[in-house]
């Protein structure tokens, strides 16, 4: 029989068509004047001159202009193509205006392309044209099919075939249902359609219009090769055979927003909009007989009909013939018939053509186990299973999130692979015979278009409805919620399936970045792999590629007709013969055998205490624990940071693979043969097995040597430590197995990859990499493992080099654009790279690589490093390691015999250690071994049960034997198979007795795999699991009873008990224990390397660090006494406080997250080789130094989330965690959320202490075990007792403001912050923080009720002291009279009354209170009464260098009035308020009221002011000759800061309307206006009521017996006349000693800060101008005000009113709002109106409204109206004085 012609030519226009139906349809539409007999088409070309219209149409093809479509914007190269395209947009009514063609009789052909399956070829999975377009991309048109001319027996002469079709055509009533069997009868096998019929007729027009082939250019070969893909996309490099395909593809790059004109849905490119517009096609010919819905495709109708109940009992079609819909043969029926013919090997079709009930299941054998959906092909089922891979799948291009893998795959096609399907031109492929039969078919009545809102599939849980069942199945996965975190990165997923899918992303990360230019000519290896038998024998790939091979097998006509395909009942793969199927089934039997063997393996006995995940081996559990080791881990090579240890390990592997890829590129570029490194087994992927259609790498790399092969698709070919352990895993096995098998597959693949990185080369050199692959001959291995650069075409290499012209000098990566290179350079920050073989350091990786060349292959370090598992230090030799253990940890129990045996074991282990490689991979492997401890030679060996560490295997074995012998009777040993040896598992219940000598790990215990076969991984773990279940925190402190999970945590905790007076010699700070001192060294690098002046106390029963030799005898006595007390304390009392943490070790939690240093301090600097050149701080690792250097990169670094500024990168990085890390730990009592669990635990202690404080005011003896031997006071912690210890230096630290003494300088500095912060707030005009409760006596605010009660107790003590001090025998007046003068009355109902009486100056030159003695004792007692406040500092007392003195102690000239004001002790520190100071009480009681100034008083020679301390005279800030005078206004100031603040250059914007004073800011003006308001209210109050003979005496008190309110008053006078500034002494500067602690000083105002960030924040206050708010039209005077104002818009309003629901940002505003709803009651009643007020400030403001109605007498005394008798008990207003405090608003 003759060969099949390549195509069918039209005799009129010389156009070519792939089959007869296309030709017949073309002649019917274009050449209606020609003969209609299809059998006379002889294929003889006719000239264009025979038909003038054809010649005119043909000439349009040569027009080279661009013709855009006005509807969709698509461009065409000629007018004919545009006209053909415009028919797709024309409505159906417009298409029928012409002569009655076949379109009228078959209207459904206008917009729906008939499937070519009716011609005997079923493509893809039988899903219509969409799946056919998918097959175009996957099989590359003709590549996957065989030569059409090869099947000589399947083709007949075309005219003969046409005649047969016409002769067998039935009448019009039969429709097309009976016509197809005539074509596909037994006598004539079905016509196999070439792959080119996938392109529609319109695309054929486009292809010929863009490129005009001449006769010499037309392809003559039947099979186009890869070289004919000459149409390349300029943006992404994708190539196509036809220009129309390229034009279609370019629409995917037209990015933008393209809304649908019907449903207004937006799309990112034109291709997506075009595909979507097909859903809105008006012509839906397929109607459902049960509901009014209609569909475009028959398969959609068939799927819809399955949703109706009772579908099987009904017969939707009237006739029993093959079901037809509007003249179309149902696609599913044709697919089933063709499938049947393919499986049975016969072309017979059912004569009845009925759609049986079970026909769907009969011809759809592949069923989904999850949803029950069935398919005809195994590949369709594999593709469908991806829809069940639920999770969150973000698109890497547009960041859209999809919820299953199938949706993501379809979504990515919209970006990169636009569908080149038919139906684009709206033309149907049908023969002339079909059209003729369709003309005789009666026209089907049109049914109204169905409603688009019909959603039959409804979710039972949430009620959401869907149109398709698959959408409902995908939606149901969203209800399976949970929290599954990836072990390699910090990402979390809502279900386990999403987590498994995410793990694959780590394995195939490079698949997304595959270079599109790597396509070339297929290699001989690939041609060899096209055989399914060879592929299955060599390697069983994932099911996606198996689907491709199956489609290739089914698309081969000769193979389908020659033999019956054999289907595997397990995986659904197809094979051409029974022999291939039997060969394939062997793999399943081996898998079943391996699963059977795995079921015999021991149970999962090792469970994680944190997440509950269980493992069979202890090593797997130890590796798994790394996922819970959260923190800030930095890579030493690129300074990248990670949240978990597992993520950093995964990152280190990436460096190793990148280096290998660059090394192989270099080798291939020089023409050398790249061989595998002998140092380890590699995880490689054969590209040929993965993608048969892809080509070799253009740089000459073999498939096993490229980066893509390392990670693509996660198909790991593992070359293990032994050849028989190389296991080939299939990707989809994780989804087909049960849950346990799935977890095992992921764990084994992950663990296999990690373990093989450290596998010695001599264990795998028997077979090498390729030797471990089964089913591969030597030639095949040689072709895979070696490559030759000359085998690649030169043009591909040229294209590669031309595309990548920009090369990175550091890593060698190439980029096509300069922008890509610039963005890539940020990945190579300057850092320190240390050689793993010598201590040399380099600035970049290229320098380190060149240095590696200097080391020889056999060069090894002098000795294997020894890692201390207690502190993490590494020692080069055993001697230094043992010396460190004896000195630092006290571990000296090793015997000489054990040492010798240990050395011999170490030497034996070192001989089997892998040789060092001359590559960067060895550096990374060394880093991995330090972190993971994969190689056990020379490292500590950790018992998996008890955590005890041994530095040799012999000691570990003896440990197991000793425990086994002592506990053999209690435990039954179980045998495990580990490396071929059975090992006994023993228990360890004698663990508590050896806790002290346990070598605790620092939380990083690792597995010791591959070291030897004598000790298995699961030693001591089965019985240890039961112990861990009963003791989840096995490491217990023997002093306080606190328990920990890890030994390293216990080691760090024990430093708290190493108490002592640790004084830093650099900054003179004192710390009570070693932990606090070490934390201080971290924060202050300048102090690092210095030893504390006083040695620490050795912990009882534990290890201690080296003592300082020089210790005082008295200090040793105190330390010994404390140690004895610690030993005497019973364990029960210590266990009661095990959860308490010493209150002095306040370590910043963010710094603990940043760096967890557990290393011991030692003088050996060589073990910390990385030193900072700025501050001298040293580190063990280069990554730590790189991380530290960020703290020196000072500048202005702003947070993008909250606009907060920072002074260095480290602060900004730590701050970003606040925004990034979720606050998942929430307090159940108050609802506050925290990022860390320990933060929540510390917060919950506050609630617990508050609950305890409500029940008992003081803790019991059991809760406070540490007692002072001198005074009997008890404490919770030893550090608090050490601070309390009374020593001779206890009184040398005194506060210059309030004369309070402290035992150490740290406590004094903490106390001085109370004074400095209040003064700084008053200087800057910033309002004070709102307090929760306030004292009614002095107005001080407190954060809690407990602080207020302590403060009121101080008032009570002060009252008693004053009463006892005035009861002396030398008092000038009686005690009762003095008590009345002072106004100190008894406390009633928690309220005290304090009245102040003023005396005029006495003739002696001293103004003396009638009750206060003029001696130092009286001064000291007055200090206990007085209050340090800047607002009251300008009355009664003077502040000289922080020393407050009374006016009776100051020598002033005659004629000046001075006043005296006493103050209450509101300034006392809460930390020191547990007990009063008895020293000054005694001096108060023993004071002589008649005595004058004592000799110890120090008077100023210029002004006569007296001081209690001599340093008060040395303060130059108040010296007369050092006064600072303004040159413009001659005003004097005490210090340069106040002078600098006072300036005349500020714009006159904020001026007071009363006194014309100019203020610098609006807040300062508002503060100033309050002074005027208070002055007026004082005057009105003074004129309202007076009591007693003195007009200056006033009392304000609440109504009712025994209640009153005090208000300080004084005589009017100018404060500057007394030498005190108007701001109340705010300009007083601190001594220079404190300047060292506040090194950051503002250049404009001189204000100093401890941190650079505080200075940066303060400098915003000086940026004066008009700063508009971006959210509201408000203008702010400076940046600081703008920042504070922006919080009103951004901060959430957490505090809501329970009555009206209004929300506020702060609790203080909510409290103020609550007064609106509260009844108008209070102690202050207005005498002119019935209003009452709770607070004095509100009452004074209200009185200001009445002041204009009051007459003022000529003498200045106000005449107040008479008050009613009921108001006589109300409080009187204070004496009018211009010195009323400006911040009276705080005295509520």
Swiss-Prot record:
Zinc listed as a keyword: yes
Function: May be involved in transcriptional regulation.
Residue numbers spanned by region Disordered: 28-48, 139-196, 306-360, 416-449, 509-531, 651-712, 889-916, 956-976, 1351-1386, 1398-1439, 1455-1489, 1579-1629, 1744-1788
Pfam families registered for this protein in UniProt: zf-C2H2, zf-C2H2_6
Bias type Basic and acidic residues, positions: 28-38, 306-333, 1351-1360
A GO term, aspect molecular function: zinc ion binding
Similarity-based family: Belongs to the krueppel C2H2-type zinc-finger protein family.
Comp. bias intervals (Acidic residues): 1374-1383
Zinc finger (C2H2-type): 8-31, 67-89, 231-253, 258-280, 286-308, 366-389, 393-415, 457-479, 484-506, 606-628, 633-655, 806-828, 833-855, 866-889, 1035-1057, 1062-1084, 1170-1192, 1197-1219, 1225-1247, 1266-1285, 1293-1315, 1333-1355, 1550-1572, 1640-1662, 1667-1689, 1695-1717, 1724-1746
PANTHER family in UniProt: BLOODY FINGERS-RELATED, KRAB AND ZINC FINGER DOMAIN-CONTAINING
Glycyl lysine isopeptide (Lys-Gly) (interchain with G-Cter in SUMO2) crosslink, residue number(s): 443, 526, 548, 1127, 1138, 1148
Bias (Basic residues): 651-664
BP terms from Gene Ontology: regulation of DNA-templated transcription
Modified residues (Phosphoserine): 601
Protein name, as recorded: Zinc finger protein 646
Composition-biased stretches (Low complexity): 345-357, 1751-1763
Source organism, top-level taxon: Eukaryota
Polar residues compositional bias, start-end: 427-440, 962-972, 1406-1425
């Amino acid at each position: 029989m003759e060969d099949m012609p390549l195509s069918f030519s039209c005799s009129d226009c010389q156009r070519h068509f792939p089959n007869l139906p296309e030709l017949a349809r073309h002649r019917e539409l274009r050449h209606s004047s020609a003969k209609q007999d299809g059998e006379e088409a002889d294929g003889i070309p006719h000239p264009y001159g025979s038909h003038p219209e054809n010649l005119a149409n043909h000439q349009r093809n040569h027009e080279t202009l661009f013709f855009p479509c006005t509807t969709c914007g698509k461009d065409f190269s000629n007018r004919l193509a545009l006209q053909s395209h415009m028919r797709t947009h024309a409505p159906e009514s417009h298409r029928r205006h012409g002569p009655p063609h076949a379109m009228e009789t078959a209207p459904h052909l206008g917009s729906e392309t008939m499937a070519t399956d009716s011609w005997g070829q079923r493509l893809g999975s039988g899903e219509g044209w969409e799946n056919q377009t998918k097959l175009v991309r996957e099989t590359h048109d003709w590549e996957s099919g065989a030569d059409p001319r090869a099947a000589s027996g399947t083709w007949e002469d075309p005219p003969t075939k046409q005649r047969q079709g016409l002769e067998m055509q039935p009448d019009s009533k039969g429709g097309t249902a009976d016509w197809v069997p005539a074509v596909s009868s037994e006598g004539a096998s079905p016509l196999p359609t070439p792959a080119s019929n996938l392109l529609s007729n319109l695309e054929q027009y486009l292809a010929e219009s863009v490129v005009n082939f001449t006769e010499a250019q037309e392809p003559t070969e039947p099979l186009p090769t890869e070289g004919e893909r000459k149409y390349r996309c300029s943006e992404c490099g994708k190539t196509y055979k036809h220009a129309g395909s390229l034009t279609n593809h370019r629409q995917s790059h037209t990015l933008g927003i393209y809304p649908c004109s019907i449903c207004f849905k937006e799309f990112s490119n034109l291709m997506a909009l075009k595909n979507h517009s097909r859903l809105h096609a008006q012509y839906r010919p397929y109607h459902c007989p049960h509901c009014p819905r209609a569909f475009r495709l028959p398969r959609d109708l068939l799927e819809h009909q399955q949703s109706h109940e009772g579908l099987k009992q009904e017969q939707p079609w009237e006739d029993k013939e093959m079901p037809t819909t509007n003249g179309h043969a149902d696609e599913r029926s044709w697919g089933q018939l063709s499938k049947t013919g393919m499986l049975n090997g016969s072309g017979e079709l059912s004569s009845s053509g009925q759609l049986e009930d079970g026909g769907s299941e009969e011809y759809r054998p592949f069923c989904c186990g999850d949803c029950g959906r069935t398919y005809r092909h195994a590949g369709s089922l594999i593709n469908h299973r991806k829809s069940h891979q639920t999770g969150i799948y973000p698109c890497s291009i547009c960041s859209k999130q999809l919820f299953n893998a199938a949706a993501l795959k379809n979504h990515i096609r919209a970006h990169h692979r636009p569908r080149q399907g038919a139906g684009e031109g709206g033309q149907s492929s049908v023969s002339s015979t079909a059209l003729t039969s369709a003309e005789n078919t009666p026209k089907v009545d049109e049914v109204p278009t169905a409603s688009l809102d019909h959603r039959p599939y409804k979710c039972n849980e949430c009620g959401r409805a869907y149109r398709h069942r698959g959408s409902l199945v995908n939606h149901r996965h969203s209800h399976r919620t949970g929290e599954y975190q990836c072990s390699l990165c910090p990402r979390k997923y809502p279900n386990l399936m999403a987590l498994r899918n995410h793990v694959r992303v780590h394995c195939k990360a490079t698949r997304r970045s595959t270079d599109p230019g790597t396509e070339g000519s297929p290699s001989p290896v690939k041609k060899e792999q096209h055989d399914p038998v060879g592929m299955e024998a060599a390697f069983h790939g994932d099911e996606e590629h198996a689907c491709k091979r199956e489609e290739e097998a089914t698309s081969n006509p000769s193979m389908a007709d020659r033999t019956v395909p054999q289907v595997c009942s397990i995986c659904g793969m197809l094979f051409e013969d029974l022999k291939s199927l039997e060969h394939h089934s062997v793999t399943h039997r081996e898998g079943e055998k391996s699963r059977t063997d795995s079921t015999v393996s021991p149970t999962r006995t090792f469970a994680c205490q944190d997440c509950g995940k269980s493992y069979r081996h202890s090593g797997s559990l130890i590796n798994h624990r790394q996922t819970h080791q959260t923190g800030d881990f930095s890579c030493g090579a690129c300074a990248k940071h990670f949240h978990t240890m597992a993520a950093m390990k995964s990152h280190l592997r990436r460096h190793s693979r990148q280096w290998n890829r660059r090394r192989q590129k270099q080798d291939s570029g020089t023409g050398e043969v790249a061989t595998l490194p002998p140092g380890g087994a590699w995880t490689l992927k054969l590209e040929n097995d993965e993608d048969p259609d892809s080509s070799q790498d253009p740089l000459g790399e073999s498939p096993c040597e490229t980066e893509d092969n390392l990670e693509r698709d996660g198909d790991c070919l593992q070359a293990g430590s032994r050849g028989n352990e190389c296991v080939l895993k299939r990707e989809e096995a994780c989804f087909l197995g049960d849950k346990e098998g799935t977890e095992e597959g992921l764990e084994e693949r992950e663990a296999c990859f990690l373990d093989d990185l450290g596998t010695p080369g001599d264990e795998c050199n028997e077979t090498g990499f390729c030797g471990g692959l089964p089913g591969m001959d030597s030639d095949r291995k040689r072709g895979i493992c070696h490559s030759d650069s000359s085998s690649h075409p030169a043009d591909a290499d040229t294209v590669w080099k031309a595309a990548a012209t920009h090369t990175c000098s550091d890593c060698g990566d190439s980029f096509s654009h300069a922008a890509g290179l610039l963005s890539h350079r940020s990945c190579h920050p300057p850092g320190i790279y240390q050689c793993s073989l010598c201590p040399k350091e380099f600035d970049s990786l290229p320098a380190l690589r060149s240095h590696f060349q200097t080391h020889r292959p056999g060069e090894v370090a002098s000795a294997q490093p020894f890692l201390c598992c207690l502190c993490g230090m590494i020692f080069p030799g055993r001697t230094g390691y043992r010396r460190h253990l004896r000195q630092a940890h006290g571990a000296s129990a090793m015997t000489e015999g054990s040492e010798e045996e240990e050395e011999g074991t170490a030497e034996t282990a070192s001989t089997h250690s892998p040789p060092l490689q001359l590559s960067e991979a060895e550096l990374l492997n060394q880093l991995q071994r330090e972190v993971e401890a994969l190689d056990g030679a020379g490292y500590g060996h950790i018992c998996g049960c008890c955590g005890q560490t041994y530095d040799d295997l012999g000691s570990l074995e003896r440990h197991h034997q000793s425990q086994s012998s002592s506990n053999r009777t209690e435990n039954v040993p179980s045998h495990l198979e580990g490396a071929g040896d059975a090992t006994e598992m023993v228990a360890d219940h004698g663990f508590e007795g050896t806790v002290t000598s346990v070598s605790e790990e620092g939380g990083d215990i690792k597995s010791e795999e591959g070291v030897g076969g004598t000790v298995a991984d699961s030693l001591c773990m089965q019985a240890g699991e039961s112990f861990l279940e009963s003791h989840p925190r096995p490491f217990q402190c023997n002093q306080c009873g606190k328990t920990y999970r890890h030994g390293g945590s216990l080691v760090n905790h024990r430093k708290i008990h190493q108490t002592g007076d640790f004084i830093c010699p650099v900054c003179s700070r004192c710390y009570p224990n070693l932990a606090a001192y070490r934390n201080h060294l971290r924060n202050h690098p300048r102090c690092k390397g210095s030893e504390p002046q006083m040695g620490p106390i050795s912990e009882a029963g534990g290890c201690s660090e080296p003592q300082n030799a020089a210790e005082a005898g008295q200090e040793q006595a105190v330390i010994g006494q404390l140690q004895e007390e610690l030993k005497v304390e019973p364990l029960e009392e210590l266990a009661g406080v095990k959860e308490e943490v010493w209150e002095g070790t306040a370590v910043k939690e963010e710094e603990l997250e940043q760096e967890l240093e557990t290393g011991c301090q030692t003088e050996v600097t060589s073990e910390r080789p990385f030193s900072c050149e700025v501050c001298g701080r040293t580190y063990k690792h280069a990554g730590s130094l790189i991380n530290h250097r960020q703290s020196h990169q000072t500048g202005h670094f702003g947070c993008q989330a909250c606009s907060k500024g920072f002074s260095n990168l480290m602060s900004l990085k730590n701050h970003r965690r606040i925004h990034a890390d979720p606050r998942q730990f929430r307090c159940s009592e108050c609802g506050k959320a925290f990022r860390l669990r320990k933060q929540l635990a510390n917060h919950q202690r506050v609630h617990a202490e508050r609950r305890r404080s409500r029940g008992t005011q003081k803790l019991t003896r059991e809760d406070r075990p540490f007692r002072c031997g001198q005074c009997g006071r008890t404490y919770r912690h030893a550090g608090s007792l050490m601070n309390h210890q009374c020593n001779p230096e206890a009184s040398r630290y005194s506060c210059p403001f309030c004369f309070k003494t402290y035992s150490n300088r740290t406590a004094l500095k903490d106390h001085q912050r109370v004074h400095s912060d209040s003064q700084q707030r008053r200087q800057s005009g910033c309002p004070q923080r709102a307090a929760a409760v306030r004292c009614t006596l002095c107005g001080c605010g407190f954060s809690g009720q407990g602080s207020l009660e302590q403060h009121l107790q101080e008032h009570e003590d002060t009252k008693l002291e004053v009463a006892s001090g005035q009861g002396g025998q030398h008092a000038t007046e009686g005690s009762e009279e003095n008590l009345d003068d002072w106004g100190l009355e008894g406390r009633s109902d928690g309220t005290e009354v304090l009245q102040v009486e003023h005396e005029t100056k006495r003739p002696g030159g001293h103004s003396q209170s009638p009750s206060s003695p003029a001696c130092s004792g009286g001064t000291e007692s007055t200090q206990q009464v007085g209050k340090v406040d800047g607002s009251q500092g300008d009355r009664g007392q003077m502040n000289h260098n922080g020393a407050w003195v009374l006016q009776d102690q100051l020598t002033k000239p005659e004629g000046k009035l001075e006043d005296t004001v006493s103050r209450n002790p509101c300034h006392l520190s809460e930390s020191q308020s547990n007990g009063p100071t008895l020293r000054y009480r005694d001096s108060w009681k023993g004071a002589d009221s008649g005595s004058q100034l004592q000799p110890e008083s120090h008077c100023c020679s210029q002004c006569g002011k007296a001081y209690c301390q001599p340093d008060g005279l040395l303060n130059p800030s108040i010296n007369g000759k050092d006064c600072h005078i303004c040159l413009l206004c001659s005003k004097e100031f005490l210090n340069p800061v106040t002078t600098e603040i006072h300036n005349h250059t500020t714009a006159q914007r904020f001026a007071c309307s009363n006194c014309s004073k100019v203020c610098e800011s609006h807040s300062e003006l508002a503060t100033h206006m309050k002074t005027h308001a208070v002055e007026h209210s004082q005057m009105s109050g003074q004129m309202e009521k007076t009591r007693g003979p003195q007009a200056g005496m006033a009392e304000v008190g609440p109504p009712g017996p025994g209640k009153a309110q005090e208000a300080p008053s004084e005589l009017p006078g100018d404060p500057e006349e007394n030498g005190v500034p108007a701001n109340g002494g705010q300009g007083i500067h601190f001594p220079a000693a404190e300047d060292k602690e506040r090194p950051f000083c503002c250049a404009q105002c001189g204000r100093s800060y401890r941190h650079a960030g505080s200075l940066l924040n303060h400098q915003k206050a000086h940026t004066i101008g008009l700063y508009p708010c971006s959210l509201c039209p408000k203008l702010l005077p400076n940046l600081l005000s703008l920042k504070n104002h922006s919080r009103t818009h951004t901060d959430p309003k957490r505090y809501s009113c329970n009555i009206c629901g209004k929300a506020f940002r702060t609790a203080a505003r909510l409290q103020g709002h609550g007064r609106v709803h509260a009844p108008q009651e209070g102690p202050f009643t207005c005498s002119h109106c019935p209003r009452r007020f709770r607070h004095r400030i509100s009452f004074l403001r209200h009185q200001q409204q009445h002041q204009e109605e009051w007459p003022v007498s000529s003498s200045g005394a106000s005449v107040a109206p008479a008050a009613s008798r009921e108001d006589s008990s109300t409080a009187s207003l204070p004496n009018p004085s211009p010195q009323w405090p400006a911040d009276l608003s705080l005295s509520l």
